[in-house]
Amino acid sequence: MTNRKDDHIRYALKYQSPYNSFDDMELIHKSLPTYDLDQIDLSTHFAGRDWVFPFYINAMTGGSAKGGAVNRKLAEVASRTGILMVTGSYSAALKGETPESFDYRQEFPDLDLATNIGVDKSVDLGIKTVEAMNPVFLQLHVNLMSPLRVTTSQDAVSFTS
């Protein structure tokens, strides 16, 4: 049996869409802007804290060695740039599956880290997650695809429950 978390990474790398959200944006070029770049402030207040940038690295992966390698790279980028990072679902760590693939604050002490678990988890598991991770915030995710089994053949992907 393959590791579902590793499957997520493999599918994300293999099945890519030519579309991205930037396709929906139109940037209007003004060769002589009327604003002072020193007056632009991207900072924001979120989760009880002030942030330099109005975005963060959202939950990606965790729970496997391959996911841990991805998270380590994301943690390094987040730490170096001051961007918050949200780990993948901490549910795997609560089961004892590679909890080290979620928290990189020993290696990157300046890392601002949040974590998430599925909305189907109990309040007790949410409390255990917060106690284990001491995150900036706990994010709940709704993942309708998790109970589905993914099968592939050549270039086709199908989902069954």
Q: What are these regions, as identified by a protein language model?
A:
Residues F55-N58, I83-G88, L113-I117, L138-L140:
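Hydrophobic faces of well-ordered beta-strands that scaffold small-molecule active sites
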Residues Y19-D23, A59-K66, Y90:
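Aromatic- and Gly/Pro-rich donor/ligand-binding loops
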Residues A75-R80, E107-F108, L113, D120-S161:
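Alpha/beta enzyme core
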Residues A47-N58, M145-R149:
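N-terminal small/glycine-rich loop or linker at the start of catalytic domains
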Residues M1-A47, W51:
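An N-cap/entry alpha-helix motif that binds or orients negatively charged groups
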